[in-house]
UniProtKB/Swiss-Prot annotation:
This is ATP synthase subunit delta. One of its GO terms (cellular component) is plasma membrane. Pfam families: OSCP. It comes from Shewanella amazonensis (strain ATCC BAA-1098 / SB2B). It is found in: Cell inner membrane. Signal peptide: none annotated. F-type ATPases have 2 components, F(1) - the catalytic core - and F(0) - the membrane proton channel. F(1) has five subunits: alpha(3), beta(3), gamma(1), delta(1), epsilon(1). F(0) has three main subunits: a(1), b(2) and c(10-14). The alpha and beta chains form an alternating ring which encloses part of the gamma chain. F(1) is attached to F(0) by a central stalk formed by the gamma and epsilon chains, while a peripheral stalk is formed by the delta and b chains.
Length: 177
């Protein structure tokens, strides 16, 4: 995965910089997301890995995407096909999404709780994280009964483990040392 990210980064950065310059970040995110889905299609995958000429592959890919790609999106596909890099489109789309969140001063936070959180609890967690991180926070909530009680919050590099299972694990580590 790290190798794909390394290969995808220059394409994602160039696309993002261009999208910001043209004030089209949202439309570029949609285009790249759609192109990533096409590249992951089980019918398309063997073609991307095959020995088809780059111009023919780019034309086929653009035809499949149809109206979902504008002229500039088509140019990106042509360049990536020329360099044999269409298979990294999902990584390009993922990096673009990360750049977009950073640019918009937003961060996604994964909140795992032992039980379903109420809307008020989700709002309280969101407000607290926004104050702490000085960014707009989008919560992705899930339930894991294995936590016993409490929550685990992951937002970028920040991890807050307020779960009973986490506290028990830390207590066990202290007792064993």
């Amino acid at each position: 995965m790290a190798e794909l990210t390394t290969i995808a980064r220059p394409y994602a950065k160039a696309a993002f910089d261009f999208a910001v310059e043209k004030q089209a970040v949202d439309s570029w995110a949609e285009m790249l997301g759609f192109a990533a889905l096409v590249s992951e299609n089980e019918t398309m995958r063997p073609l991307l890995a095959g020995s088809m000429a780059s111009s023919a592959l780019a034309k086929l890919f653009i035809d499949v995407c149809g109206e979902q790609l504008n002229e500039h999106g088509q140019n990106l596909i042509k360049v990536m096909a020329e360099n044999g890099r269409l298979e990294v489109l999902p990584a390009v789309a993922q990096l673009f999404a990360e750049y977009r969140l950073e640019w918009a001063k937003e961060v996604e936070a994964d909140v795992v709780s032992a039980t379903e959180l109420s809307d008020a609890q989700q709002q309280q967690i969101g407000v607290s994280l926004e104050k702490r991180l000085a960014r707009k926070v989008k919560l992705n909530c899930s339930v894991d009964a294995g936590l016993i009680a409490g929550v685990i919050i992951k937002a970028g590099d920040l991890v807050i483990d307020g779960s009973v299972s986490g506290k028990l694990a830390r207590l066990s580590d202290k007792l064993q040392s």
